[in-house]
Amino acid sequence: MNSNNWLGFPLSPNNSSLPPHEYNLGLVSDHMDNPFQTQEWNMINPHGGGGDEGGEVPKVADFLGVSKPDENQSNHLVAYNDSDYYFHTNSLMPSVQSNDVVVAACDSNTPNNSSYHELQESAHNLQSLTLSMGTTAGNNVVDKASPSETTGDNASGGALAVVETATPRRALDTFGQRTSIYRGVTRHRWTGRYEAHLWDNSCRREGQSRKGRQVYLGGYDKEDKAARSYDLAALKYWGPSTTTNFPITNYEKEVEEMKHMTRQEFVAAIRRKSSGFSRGASMYRGVTRHHQHGRWQARIGRVAGNKDLYLGTFSTEEEAAEAYDIAAIKFRGLNAVTNFEINRYDVKAILESSTLPIGGGAAKRLKEAQALESSRKREAEMIALGSSFQYGGGSSTGSGSTSSRLQLQPYPLSIQQPLEPFLSLQNNDISHYNNNNAHDSSSFNHHSYIQTQLHLHQQTNNYLQQQSSQNSQQLYNAYLHSNPALLHGLVSTSIVDNNNNNGGSSGSYNTAAFLGNHGIGIGSSSTVGSTEEFPTVKTDYDMPSSDGTGGYSGWTSESVQGSNPGGVFTMWNE
């Protein structure tokens, strides 16, 4: 065998295993059952003729090329043999390798030599090469013949073509290719949404050849959200040295939060934030609205023999979401994907329960617990507010209204202690003080006022020894507001004025004593020669002026009750 022969079978004419055959070399071989298909070179006559000008089809004189055996060995051209051997794969060559080369040549000098698989045509009918390209056309290489050979072939009406066969793309070539540009993200082939997965190689399941398991991180509408979920899970599992889709500096806040959580808890938190799958008209997982009565119904899938479990209908979607969460915890444990935070539920009671605590049980208990917790918070707020709350009491002065504040504390004095100034003002007969001189009456009133203020000041000093932080005005103001029954003391006096009325008429006076914000107010209403009902007048006044003149300015009077509005006057307002 020649050392230059690369075909794998002998080209010697003495080989008896290759008997000569005659072929009708037209457009298609007569013995071919199947035509040429795509990704092959077809030799087609554009004019539809396969013979010479005389209409005769050229015959194969010597199939093995007895006339020119040297050219067969020097040119290394492929001679076609039995069609059953060479065309069983619908290609021009036996598929020895993926890149087989087929050379077909035509020589006008040897018209009867068909050992080179020559197709005889007329000078003006040139054969054309038709190329059917598929998806792998970029892998095909066509080598043209040299210019000298092309010139000789064109002159004789032949053509030379070198063809490199294409390799079909196998299914295994596409296996494992990513459907997303991000790591750990795949695109669902049906829904078109994106899912994030993480491969946890820290464990090995029984019966698996590959170490580890796939951790589902949820489905997402956006590809970048799924990529971020993968990054967070990868940082939790493998630390900052892992490869992420986005810079680690984008996750500084999440990295601090994940330090206080386990892997399972953090993955569950990531999955709770997923929003990729349709949930009907509700924003909660496992909750849909009933199409007839509009109530919310809850379902959970893949629990009862890999089927959906109907959980019931609820008036609100929050209750339906809670029912789904309880069922998810019951069937899937701590790794369950819930609508609300898992610490809202009594996980231990749910897992230990022999039945599913749904149907007004767990949801109502949850609401009761929330109501109790909110009431406790309100009580704590009230206690904290009461410790710093200042009770405001208004004091009426001549210049305006000011507000004094006092902490809500019980008044330390007993009831009997502040009664002394009131008793000293009641049922006092002051007729022996009545003179014709107005100055004497004013002196008496001034003396009575000073005695009362000294009495009050003594009690104030006793209290200030116990509570040095509060002044007397604030304490008595708060005490009098909390004990309104002690505010009014009625002083009835009967004065007969013989000087002014000349003995012809009598005057009746009703005087009301009132302990106001800062001292004592005295109001009076009078009628002359009448027995009608007298109104009670409450009079407030300011403290004595600081200039030492002893004047009483800023007195005001207010009618409290009575059918006679007349006779109200301002005292000591000269």
From Swiss-Prot:
It comes from Arabidopsis thaliana (Mouse-ear cress). This is AP2-like ethylene-responsive transcription factor PLT1. It comes from the Eukaryota. Expressed in roots, seedlings, flowers, and siliques. Also detected at low levels in leaves. In roots, specifically detected in the distal root meristem, including the QC. This tissue specificity is regulated by auxin gradient and depends on PIN proteins. The keyword NADP does not apply. Belongs to the AP2/ERF transcription factor family. AP2 subfamily. InterPro entries: AP2/ERF_dom, AP2/ERF_dom_sf, DNA-bd_dom_sf. Keywords: Activator, Auxin signaling pathway, Developmental protein, DNA-binding, Ethylene signaling pathway, Nucleus, Repeat, Stress response, Transcription, Transcription regulation. One of its GO terms (cellular component) is nucleus. The gene is PLT1.
